[in-house]
A protein has these predicted regions:
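Conserved structural elements of the adenylate-forming
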Residues: 16-40
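Conserved adenylation A10 loop of the ANL superfamily
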Residues: 2-17
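Conserved AMP-binding loop of ANL adenylate-forming enzymes
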Residues: 34-71
């Protein structure tokens, strides 16, 4: 596999490359710390990925990371809520509604820009959710292609107000 950087540092003209002849070591180096630091209290959790998955972007280590998280730690109802058109808002809303009605903790995973698009959509439709205790947000950073100027603190405040997930359950990778 060849993982490539986005190239934004050089205006998209140069993309760094990271070669992996075998992904077995890469996968283990992802799974073991993920379980230890993100999932120490449970084997599985329902996961909603709000960024591209591995099948959409095979040159992205982040896309592989998110896909592996669902494979190794996702429970029934987990999935990727992003396609070639962007966020699948109707499916995300259904996921969040189910999480609230089931009262089970869930985890959202994605880049910061996806969280902003989700927040904007939820605000526009006057939607808030009270996700179960121990729900968590996994933010991988990256405000690329966002039109809204916001700090990480402001985003975390909005996420807590909109989804009911306290800051201490938000991880930034």
């Amino acid at each position: 596999a060849v993982f490539m950087t986005s190239g934004t540092t050089h205006g998209g003209k140069m993309r760094g490359r990271n070669f992996h002849p075998d992904l077995e070591v890469w996968d283990e180096s992802m799974i073991v710390p993920f379980r230890h630091f993100i999932m120490p209290d449970r084997e599985r959790i329902r996961i909603a990925v709000i960024s591209p998955a591995w099948d959409m972007n095979q040159n992205s280590s982040l896309s592989r990371y998110l896909t592996k998280a669902v494979e190794c730690c996702g429970s029934e109802g987990s999935g990727v809520f992003f396609d070639e058109h962007g966020l699948k808002f109707d499916e995300i809303i259904a996921f969040l509604n189910r999480a609230v009605s089931d009262g089970e903790p869930v985890m959202l995973m994605g880049v910061s820009s996806s969280y902003l698009y989700l927040l904007d959509y939820l605000h526009e439709h006057d939607l808030t959710f009270a996700l179960a205790p121990d729900s968590r947000l996994f933010d991988t950073g990256g405000f690329k292609s966002t039109k809204r100027d916001i700090t990480e603190d402001q985003m975390l405040d909005e996420l807590e107000q909109t989804l009911g997930v306290p800051r201490h359950h938000c991880v930034n990778m």
